[in-house]
Amino acid sequence: MNKQIQTEADELGFFGEYGGQYVPETLMPAIIELKKAYKEAKADPEFQRELEYYLSEYVGRTTPLTYAASYTESLGGAKIYLKREDLNHTGAHKINNALGQALLAKRMGKKKLVAETGAGQHGVASATVAALFDMELVVFMGSEDIKRQQLNVFRMELLGAKVVAVEDGQGTLSDAVNKALQYWVSHVDDTHYLLGSALGPDPFPTIVRDFQSVIGKEIKSQILKKEGRLPDAIVACIGGGSNAIGTFYPFIKDDVALYGVEAAGQGEDTDKHALAIGKGSPGVLHGTKMYLIQDEGGQVQLAHSISAGLDYPGIGPEHSYYHDIGRVTFENASDTQAMNALINFTKHEGTIPAIESAHALSYVERLAPTMSKEDIIVVTISGRGDKDMETIRQYMAERGLAND
């Protein structure tokens, strides 16, 4: 494995040609302050101890790495292990990062938080830590996503957050990020922007990756204990890329195949997809250079996915770099493929995954049968499907699948 891979952003915040700090001058002092504070916190054993305490006692880590016996047998190939991020408090991987950033904000003396959310999982995780640490929180959420995720909106409000509907654009995650950044610019003195994915201006991609890499670190020690070796392949779904980068990062320099699964929406040959790598090109959005779905004129296009957490038109800078150097292979799953995998997996394993995670499972169902029974695949179940029950029910009813 090539040991020359760049695994940290350079001084200007770039991974290869991706990343950077494309923000208005007014935000630069806050970005510089954040970078300095994070560097100090990262090197402070007391901060790390506090983070570990809350991850263990509040979030419920370590999450299990479960051998999926029935699923493995049904696919007839490689052994499949599930990294159970769905078992975290709040039901997804998002809490790992929300908790870390809230502790960082507290350390910086910030009393208020602002966040964006798509599926509502990052919003719920942010509202949870805001309640825990007695901080105010404003969450921006696209109006379209609010319709899809009523239950999560109620959860956030119950936890004390103020949820603001974003009507601009398509009313989804990308528009919510725009609004959250604008809000941060005008409230920068007392507010920390709790960004939920591995994107945005440097140092956000690094901060989010570091707080999420607990996933991959745990996988590494767990699989060595269970199998005495590293897996042959690791699979994770990709929207902005936080669960995937957290899963992959500890394995970047190991001889392990890494697969990121993007949302192909209604299909690669339509314009209703979220294939930033598959059909995009490099561009700048939300403060960073990364792969984006855009037209020839550089206009960012609307992303589509049945999963509210994957309909983002970009993919974080570190993933963009790993794609260019060939370290991570990007595959995709359509809405239909993801939903079929969700139904199949649930019937075999008794676990209802989030629709996001089902995109990764769809690729596992294609990959596993091509591998030998001695091979090992680890797939990250990034979240549980509770938030998606209405979407799943509707999908199955429309197709007459309800009683299959």
From Swiss-Prot:
N6-(pyridoxal phosphate)lysine, modified sites: K94
Domain of life: Bacteria
Keyword Amino-acid biosynthesis: yes
Reactions that this protein is recorded to catalyse: (1S,2R)-1-C-(indol-3-yl)glycerol 3-phosphate + L-serine = D-glyceraldehyde 3-phosphate + L-tryptophan + H2O
Molecular function in Gene Ontology: tryptophan synthase activity
TM spans (from-to): none
GO CC annotations, alphabetized: cytoplasm
Main enzyme class: lyase
EC assignment: 4.2.1.20
Biological pathway: Amino-acid biosynthesis; L-tryptophan biosynthesis; L-tryptophan from chorismate: step 5/5
Keywords: Amino-acid biosynthesis, Aromatic amino acid biosynthesis, Lyase, Pyridoxal phosphate, Tryptophan biosynthesis
Known cofactor(s): pyridoxal 5'-phosphate
InterPro entries assigned to the protein according to its UniProt record, in alphabetical order: Trp_synth_b_CS, Trp_synth_beta, Trp_synth_beta/beta-like, TrpB-like_PALP, TrpB-like_PALP_sf
UniProt xrefs under Pfam families: PALP (PF00291)
Function: The beta subunit is responsible for the synthesis of L-tryptophan from indole and L-serine.
Family: Belongs to the TrpB family.
Self-association and partners: Tetramer of two alpha and two beta chains.
Protein name in the entry: Tryptophan synthase beta chain
Source organism per UniProt: Staphylococcus aureus (strain bovine RF122 / ET3-1)
